[in-house]
Structures are given as C-alpha cells and as structure tokens.
Amino acid sequence: MSNVSGILETAGVPLVSANWPQPSPPPAVPAGPQMDHMGNSSQGAPWLFLTSALARGVSGIFVWTALVLTCHQIYLHLRSYTVPQEQRYIIRLLLIVPIYAFDSWLSLLLLGDHQYYVYFDSVRDCYEAFVIYSFLSLCFQYLGGEGAIMAEIRGKPIKSSCLYGTCCLRGMTYSIGFLRFCKQATLQFCLVKPVMAVTTIILQAFGKYHDGDFNVRSGYLYVTLIYNASVSLALYALFLFYFTTRELLRPFQPVLKFLTIKAVIFLSFWQGLLLAILERCGVIPEVETSGGNKLGAGTLAAGYQNFIICVEMLFASVALRYAFPCQVYAEKKENSPAPPAPMQSISSGIRETVSPQDIVQDAIHNFSPAYQHYTQQATHEAPRPGTHPSGGSGGSRKSRSLEKRMLIPSEDL
C-alpha cells in the first residue's frame, strides 16, 4: 500500500480531491471565564453567598416569620390599649423587629457596588436610639414617674460596683441629678444618631464615606468614633438606672425585658465591630461578582451583618413575645365598664404610639436650665412602685392623647 502511495505522489496525483469537504476546525474557546450549566463561573469571579438566591431566600423566611409574630403581638396590645402610658412604649419597643428585619433584608437584596444599604442602615440605626430611650421611659412609667422614683431612692448611698461602673461614685447619694443624667444620656443618642445618619448620607454622596475605611481622610473613622461614644454613654445610663432600681422593678419581671433589648442592641453593635476588625485584618477581602462588579470589603462586612440580623430577629420576636405579654392589659379591658369600639381603640392607639409629642416634651424638660429646681410628675396619682396604674378602659381619647404634666419643686420630694 505504501508503494502505491509513493507511485501516485510521483505521478502528481493528489491523494485527497480538492472537491472533497475539508474537516472543520475545532470551535474557538472564549478567553473569559467559563460558565457551567448552573450559571456559576468556573473560574475568575467566585460564587458569593450573600448575592445568591439561597441567602435571600433563607433571610426572607426568617424576616417574614418574625414580622408575622411581632405584628400579631402589636395588634393584641392595640386591641387592649388600657394603659397607654406604658403600652405606647411597649409597642415602640416591639417595632424594633419589623424595622430591623425588613431594613436589613432590603439592604441584603440591594447589596452591590452602589452601596444603597447605607441609606437603609441609617434608618435602622436611628431607631436604635429611639429604642434605648423608650425602654428607659417605660421603666419610669412602671415606677410611677420621676417623683415616685425619687421618693424611693433619694438620699440613699450609691453602692460601689466595678461591674455596674459605680466604683468611682463611692460616698455619693442619689439625687434628682441622677435621674436627669439617665434621661439626658439616652436623649443625646436620639439626637446624635440622626445627625450622624444624615452626615453619612452626605459623605456617601460625595464619595467620602466607605465602610471599614479607617483612613483619616475618610468620614467613616469620625462617624464611628462619635457613634460609639454616644451609644456607649446611652447604654451605660440604661445599665446604671437598672442597677439602681432593679429591686423596685422586680414585680414587672425586668430581667427578660432588659436582656432582650440589650441583646438586640449589643449584638448588632458588637457584630458590626467584629466584622469591621475582620475586614481590617484582611479576613473579609474585596471580591468581584460574576457580573463584573467589585464589592469592597466594607460592603461585604455590612452584608454579613444584615444577613445575621435577619436571622436574629426571629429569635428576638419570640423573646419579646414573652418579655412584653398583653394578658395583664387584656384583663383590664375585660373589667372595664364601657370599652371603646375596637377600631376606634386601635386607631387612637396607633396615633398615640407614633406621635413624638412626649419625646419633644421630655427633651425640653430634661435639658431645661430650670430642671435643678423642678421635677416632672403626671397629674394623675402615681402608683406605688411595683403596682400597675389603676385600670380604666382608656376609652377617653382626650385623656390618652393629652397627658398633662406639672412641675413641682424637687425639694418637696
């Protein structure tokens, strides 16, 4: 066979006809990243959990379950809105779950290089300040107001404790200035946090704010320092007030309430701090998504924070359900001689809960130069610490929405 091939080649006869079809070349392989049948990049951009449907689906399940549980509890309180001086603060505390959960979920859905999450997180952080103030105000209402509290603690020596941060107050006694400090420390956070939120949004618009950027030319460093100092002062005041009045608050079972609120705030605070440290140490690196967008390390840290909060809010909703039950208020409604119409009661309760009138009045009172001569007390007879105020249906809209206050000399307390 080889001899025949040689003879044909010598004679100039081609072995393959020119008219025969030539074999097609192999298909060209694109130089970019290869995509498998699942749509994930086989090389180049890694698979990112935070932007996956799995992360959004899991977080969504936790968020919507928490929303259903908490909204049902809020509805029960509005149906039995018999002690508005207490329940308006309870409802405000319960709202931390819908606001934290839904806000974090939206931030996770919009995670990307545009950093839309900064705007949502600002709303969440502002409500954090509102929660600290509302919890302190609820404790004041439990004990009958400033006048009733001072009647119990005034003149008593302050116990020195390193755990509660009173070791430097040895030899001092409680006075009206103590209550003023507790209120001012929480109210300042209600002022500082919105200012920092607006500042963050402005710096973000001008490209001067990036999460995790501790450069002295970046606004993140200064916003973080001011925020941490402000929230630490507010939490210290809340802790100090609980240390002082824990025996008076015992009938109201404050431990679960206190631990639940502190856990929600502290966990978000320390989680954010830990993630910032991990990002700073390079544990959380900058990544590139399959769409070609680059996500900074600070953006990823904020994304992990939002995902964790989505999961935690379900457990917070369950804990708050036990911490702030509505049975005691429902019993007062049953014993009421003339309960109001359900829809009227719910609508008026919502209006009173969302109204910031009491916060403005409290801020004016506690930062007034005349505070050292006066203290605040409700015109209705304040109950003794450890007892709920006497019932009534709360049906009178006027008596609930207009809580009259009078000033009496602190010397009379």
Curated annotation (Swiss-Prot):
Keywords tagged on the record: Cell membrane, Cytoplasm, Cytoplasmic vesicle, Endosome, Membrane, Transmembrane, Transmembrane helix
A Pfam family reported for this protein in Swiss-Prot or TrEMBL: Solute_trans_a
Entry comment describing in which tissues the protein is expressed: Expressed in vascular cells (at protein level).
Region (Disordered): 372-413
Gene Ontology molecular function, alphabetical: heparin binding; transmembrane transporter activity
Entry's transmembrane regions: 47-69, 93-113, 130-150, 187-207, 223-243, 258-278, 300-320
Top-level division of the source organism's lineage: Eukaryota
Subcellular location: Cell membrane; Cytoplasm, Perinuclear region; Cytoplasmic vesicle membrane; Early endosome membrane
Role of this protein: Acts as a heparin receptor in vascular cells. May be involved in vesicle transport in exocrine cells and Sertoli cells.
Family the entry assigns: Belongs to the TMEM184 family.
Name of this chain's protein: Transmembrane protein 184A
Organism this protein belongs to: Homo sapiens
Lineage of producing organism: Eukaryota, Metazoa, Chordata, Craniata, Vertebrata
Gene: TMEM184A
